[in-house]
């Protein structure tokens, strides 16, 4: 009952004096159902030794959320998807229905590019300025030149598309195509 009222979580992030850490680890006992070493036991040791101990709060709980099952993994993915999309929109990319656009971290997209729903941009994809990526497109590890239009449901993989080129709809560029 008492545990249910606790509104804090252990993020697993610790700042610890190295000497204390190494001596403390040797003294941690594995007296639990899993037979595991519990690093939080170091906190109790530190308190008993009158070491300085402090808990910190984080302004954004989503940044330190635990992931212990597929639901929490999905929630963490959603946090990251929103962060990536928001950063791109603030830099001048237009997203029509950003809730349904999936862009991997590290993808580069130029200003004034418009991305339609259900687009997937993955790996080291680079999209130039003033491009249009229509609905249902998947672009993986490819470069799309400025002013190009990738029409609906096209798949481009490990290829290069030049400037002011129109691809699709329903096109498939296999690896190493240069258009």
Predicted features, each with a name:
Residues 97-99, 104-105, 110-111, 116-117, ...:
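Left-handed beta-helix
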Residues 30, 81-82, 118, 130:
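Short, solvent-exposed amphipathic alpha-helical segments in soluble enzyme
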Residues 77-106:
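Long, charged amphipathic helices and adjacent flexible linkers at domain junctions
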